[in-house]
A protein has these predicted regions:
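Short helix/strand-bridging catalytic loops that position acidic/His residues to coordinate divalent metals
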Residues: 22-25, 73-82, 102-104, 136-142
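Extended amphipathic alpha-helical segments with heptad-repeat/coiled-coil character used for oligomerization
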Residues: 105-109
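Acidic, glycine-rich catalytic/binding loops that coordinate metals and/or anionic ligands
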Residues: 1, 84-86, 110-187
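Short glycine/threonine/proline-enriched tight-turn/helix- or strand-capping micro-motif at secondary-structure
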Residues: 2-38
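Short glycine-rich beta-strand segments
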Residues: 63-65, 99, 120-122
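A structural signal for short beta-strand/turn segments enriched in small hydrophobics and glycine
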Residues: 42-44, 85-100
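Serine endopeptidase catalytic core focused on the charge-relay Asp
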Residues: 13-19, 92-93, 113-119
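Zn2+-dependent peptidoglycan hydrolase active-site motif and core
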Residues: 31-33, 39-82, 110, 114-116
Length: 187
């Protein structure tokens, strides 16, 4: 399905860096009526409450500071973000973050409402410098928490192993994955 992680779109030519979870229930007007919960405890590092500012729509990013290296989870296309949450807020596991929705900087039909969920690593602490060198015509409104600066891992196998406590650090988990490519860099 196109909601899975990996090369699942456009006949395998487009990479989907997260997992799309569809609603279990809808209200009388057909809107998704599911709460979105945090997968792990963490701290809110980014909160975008303006749909048009991102293809992710309304979204937030948690840093899971008890993990080494820290991982990030991203919750996108939210209809709303729970009142009282702000950057720096600590979040418990299974805490309500918001409502599932269809927000984005483009149109997602109501019947395609979903949660776009990612788990991954942040590439750099100096993303803005990289962004400024590119020919983008829009402002980076998300600092180091732009989707371009987060690299996802497949959430399903990671979270399954995390729940079983089958690794002691995310690095141990990442090292257990098969090598996808090897590069030789010459200067």
């Amino acid at each position: 399905s196109s909601g899975a992680f990996g090369c699942v779109r456009n006949n395998g030519f487009k990479f989907h860096e997260g997992l799309d979870l569809y609603p279990v229930k809808r209200d009388g007007r057909g809107r998704a009526d599911d709460n979105v919960f945090s997968a792990m405890e963490g701290v809110i590092r980014h909160l975008n409450a303006t749909s048009g500012y991102s293809a992710y729509g309304k979204y937030l990013v948690l840093e899971h500071t008890t993990l080494n290296p820290p991982l990030y989870s991203l919750y996108a296309h939210l209809a709303s973000i729970e009142d009282g949450l702000k950057v720096g807020s600590s979040v418990r596991v299974a805490q309500v973050l918001g409502k599932m929705g269809n927000t984005a900087s483009y149109r997602i039909p109501l019947d395609r409402s979903h949660l776009h969920f990612e788990i991954g690593l942040r590439l750099t602490d100096d993303f803005q410098r990289w962004y400024d060198k590119k020919p983008y015509t829009t402002k980076n409104r998300h600092g180091n928490f732009s989707g371009f600066n987060l690299v996802g891992i497949d959430p399903l196998p990671f979270y399954s192993e995390y729940q079983k406590k089958s690794f002691s650090t995310p690095l141990e988990y990442l090292r257990s994955l098969p090598v996808a490519a090897k590069l030789r860099v010459r200067s």
